[in-house]
């Protein structure tokens, strides 16, 4: 009886803490907090403060610096440089597979885009149309297709790589909120990924269109791409770029870096119908490493 009461009490306390956490997410000035975090993360002086921030982060989150190209944390010019650190050569060999994991992290969800909806968590869904900023034509390209949502934890390698070779056809920056992205918010915030600020990147590949959606979150100091650098559009206004009309194309090979998160978040992959089959070992919570096999062409 005591154990039952303890379980009920623990579950009740957890529920209260989760409710308070979500309430905090709604009342805190999300963008101001993220800008302040970005300011601190870019500080180069005083060096003792920069080094202390990095050292405490490594200790708290258990970052494996043996994989880094530069393992001495004091040699990073600022926290952002440390957070987006490169890996040593050979740390992430590319698998001989059709489709590679684009990032270190964990599978949040993956599966079919059924009736235009992507599964979020515990009975919560969001539409591909909403995720892509209301673009009906783009969303139709992925109707009945497959999606994979990968969450990058603070300790992870935070550069994103191409799961397949592709030519960039367009991008769309979509302004939004900056809820934290984790299990608690996924289970309690409706349409989380379709509400947060995000950058949608569209590619033409050998099997058809593919979308990579880089989702921002609270205290994420920024998103960068290899073709345009930091994404810094006017606030509260969507910005679309058609790369097919530009004089020089952006073509990336499978495994090439395509972008990075300043303090991390989530990447969502969208594939068309009857094109992709994910490896059976992947499911919600499965850890991923950039470059390992994610799936194959159907």
Where are the model-predicted features located?
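Contiguous, well-folded functional domains in the mature portion of proteins
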Residues: 5-298
């Amino acid at each position: 009886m005591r154990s039952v009461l303890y379980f009920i009490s623990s579950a009740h306390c957890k529920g209260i803490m989760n409710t308070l956490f979500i309430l905090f997410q709604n009342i805190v000035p999300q963008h101001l907090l993220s800008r302040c975090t970005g300011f601190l993360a870019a500080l180069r002086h005083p060096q003792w403060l920069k080094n202390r921030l990095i050292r405490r982060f490594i200790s708290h989150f258990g970052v494996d610096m043996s994989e880094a190209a530069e393992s001495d944390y004091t040699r990073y010019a600022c926290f952002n440089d440390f957070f987006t650190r490169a890996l040593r050569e050979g740390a992430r060999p590319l698998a001989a597979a059709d489709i590679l994991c684009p990032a270190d992290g964990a599978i949040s969800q993956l599966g079919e885009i059924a009736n235009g909806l992507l599964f979020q968590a515990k009975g919560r869904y969001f539409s591909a149309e909403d995720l892509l900023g209301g673009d009906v034509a783009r969303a139709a390209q992925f109707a009945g297709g497959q999606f994979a949502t990968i969450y990058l934890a603070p300790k992870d390698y935070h550069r994103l790589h191409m799961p397949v070779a592709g030519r960039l056809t367009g991008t769309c920056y979509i302004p939004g909120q900056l809820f934290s992205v984790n299990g608690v918010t996924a289970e309690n915030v409706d349409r989380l990924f379709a509400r947060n600020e995000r950058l949608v990147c569209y590619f033409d590949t050998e099997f058809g269109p593919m979308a990579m959606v880089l989702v921002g979150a609270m205290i994420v100091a920024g998103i960068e791409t290899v073709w345009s650098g930091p994404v810094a559009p006017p606030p509260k206004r969507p910005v679309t770029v058609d790369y097919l009309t530009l004089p020089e194309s952006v073509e990336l090979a499978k495994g090439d870096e395509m972008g990075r998160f300043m303090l991390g978040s989530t990447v969502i992959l969208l594939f068309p119908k009857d094109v992709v089959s994910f490896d059976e070992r992947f499911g919600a919570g499965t850890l991923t490493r950039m470059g390992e096999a994610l799936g194959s062409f159907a």
